[in-house]
Amino acid sequence: MTLTGFRHQPVMLREVLEWLDPKPGGTYVDCTLGGGGHALGVLERIGGRGLLVGIDRDADALAAAAFRLAGYGDGVRLVQADFRELAAVLRRLETGPVQGILYDLGVSSHQLDTASRGFGYQQDAPLDMRMDPGGGVTAADLVNRLPEDELSDLIKAYGEERWSRRIAAFIARERKREPILTTGRLAEVIKEAVPARARRTGPHPARRTFQALRIAVNDELGALKTSLHQAVDLLDAGGRVVVLSYHSLEDRLVKDTFREFAVHCKCPPGLPECRCGVVPRLDILTSRPRVPGEDEIAANPRARSAKLRAARKRADVLKDKGVK
């Protein structure tokens, strides 16, 4: 990889900065640093007295971001980690409460376009899909080892794929002949499994299955839920969390998590007064997700499915806990 050639076009940058609202001298965390496009926008707002913590599992992304953000010196701290380790990372850096946390979920353009990473179905490459190539199961492990019914359930749950049973059956048949070890071969098997009438319109027939495998390999939804819960604890009063998601599973999880922390009462209906003692911790800022404009989609088609949600830590939470 050449650092200057790392492809990164930040999605909805203007909207991210609007809802994150970085303040001079503040501390902000980019949990999915990528090439550093969003981080650069934040750094321009917070100035020399601020701090930007960038987290990413991908060593290539960290190297590219370090190159891009080098001019900000001690105002940038970059860490290779899974964002489910957010609390541990900030504790180690001794940042204290932070004023904003950003997530730009999913796979980056660089990862999709780098054939050797095995995320894409347009090129033939080893069937990998790990965000951190240093360890863990690969997509090939799942495709070749999972029982057919478990593979079908995985594709259905994480890919919302209508033809999951048929795809799993075709995969099980083909792997008996020879292990499926490349993205190209898996894409061909999926294409054969999906009926011709369903292939005539819409995205590539392999898209949903590849999404499902990637989510499973990296435990993306589990990591997101864990990290969002930590983010609520780590935010300062009035601090904001902004999330860009790219498919319905991510967006639903973000929406439900924000609602969980914004609820005023969990008592059963019918009680004359609240007895649960639940205190809302977030104010939801985006009643509906924000989406990219037509001009951005034309310039960057991969932004098409993006949805932005934002929430703010309530100031009265700290007062209720006796924090002055």
From Swiss-Prot:
Name of a matching Pfam family: Methyltransf_5
Q: Where does S-adenosyl-L-methionine bind?
A: 36-38, 56, 83, 104, 111
What is the protein name stated in its UniProt record? Ribosomal RNA small subunit methyltransferase H
Q: Name one GO cellular component term.
A: cytoplasm
Q: Which family does the entry's similarity section mention? A: Belongs to the methyltransferase superfamily. RsmH family.
Q: Which reaction does it catalyse?
A: cytidine(1402) in 16S rRNA + S-adenosyl-L-methionine = N(4)-methylcytidine(1402) in 16S rRNA + S-adenosyl-L-homocysteine + H(+)
Q: Which UniProt keywords apply?
A: Cytoplasm, Methyltransferase, rRNA processing, S-adenosyl-L-methionine, Transferase
Q: What is its EC number?
A: 2.1.1.199
